[in-house]
From Swiss-Prot:
Species name: Rhizobium meliloti (strain 1021) (Ensifer meliloti)
E.C. no: 1.17.1.8
Binding site residues for NADP(+): R39
Keyword Isomerase (UniProt): no
Protein name: 4-hydroxy-tetrahydrodipicolinate reductase
Length: 272
């Protein structure tokens, strides 16, 4: 352990991503686990966070006191739920630390409140923290710009494990936003998320979404751009949840030296 290591807090420490984040922090140079947070009443309160994550004893007990942890930390890694993330955004702003947000399913109001917190915190938010997906977003934007809506239809297909609670996934929406930017349109006005019964012909220029859920799939995403007589498919497969955790830790380290503001993984990776 080095005194210059960035002190990080993991919220939602007992969840799948929380445990993965703890393990990745443990094995990554330049960072250390400062605190692990769970909800009040969680059976994991008081447990050693390292043992909980399968990384061995780390001397950090799981607690339900986020503000106390934040004020002594430098960053928080957050893959929780929208309501919790909004609360953590306010606390991170009070503590003026880095807030890395991988939470998906946020409403427009949630997004506005998270962005408001960025006046005092360094917020880095993305629907996906992996390098591969963010590169896929850049390629999707370029392809959507190059292939005109009059002859090319865009569909985004995603599949995740059966426990995922939001749809479309944050990554699918990230890709949809990239396609919309390429076309110079607003995604909210052009997305089609449900098809059932007699739908009629596909609206020209729309961006369709298809969602699959089942098994233990970590994440599969494809952007299909279909023309007359040919089709372009851009895709990404996640086979290990640690790619998101590694990206989140990299984002925290990047944000450490930045001014308060709202950033994305495109900023972190230099792809913007």
């Amino acid at each position: 352990m080095n005194e210059t290591d960035m002190k990080l807090v993991v919220v939602g420490a007992a969840g799948r991503m929380g445990q993965t984040l703890i393990r990745i922090i443990h094995e990554t140079a330049g960072v250390r686990l400062h605190a692990a947070i769970e909800r009040t009443g969680s059976p994991f309160i008081g447990r050693d966070a390292g043992e909980l994550a399968g990384a061995g004893p780390m001397g950090v007990a799981v607690t339900d006191k986020p503000l106390e942890a934040f004020v002594e930390a430098e960053g928080v890694l957050d893959f929780t739920a929208p309501a919790a993330t909004v609360e953590f955004a306010g606390l991170a702003a009070q503590a003026r630390i880095v807030h890395v947000v991988g939470t998906t399913g946020c409403s427009a109001d949630d997004e506005a409140r998270i962005r408001a917190a960025a006046r005092h915190a360094r917020v880095i938010k993305s629907g996906n923290m992996s390098l591969g997906v963010n590169l896929l977003g850049v390629l999707t934007e370029k392809a959507a710009r190059a292939l005109p809506a009059g002859g090319w239809d865009i569909e985004i297909l995603e599949m995740h494990h059966k426990h995922k609670v939001d749809a479309p996934s944050g990554t699918a929406l990230l890709l949809g936003e990239a396609a919309a930017r390429g076309r110079g349109i607003d995604l909210a006005d052009h997305s089609v998320r449900v098809r059932d019964g007699h739908t009629g012909a596909r609206p020209e220029g729309s961006i369709g979404f298809a969602t699959l859920r089942g098994g233990s799939v970590i994440g599969e995403h494809s952007v299909v751009i279909a023309g007359e007589g040919e089709m372009v498919t851009l895709s990404h497969s996640a086979t290990d949840r640690s790619i998101f955790a590694r990206g989140a830790v990299a984002a925290a380290l990047w944000g450490r030296s930045r001014k308060p503001g709202f950033y994305s993984m495109l900023d972190v990776l230099g792809l913007d």
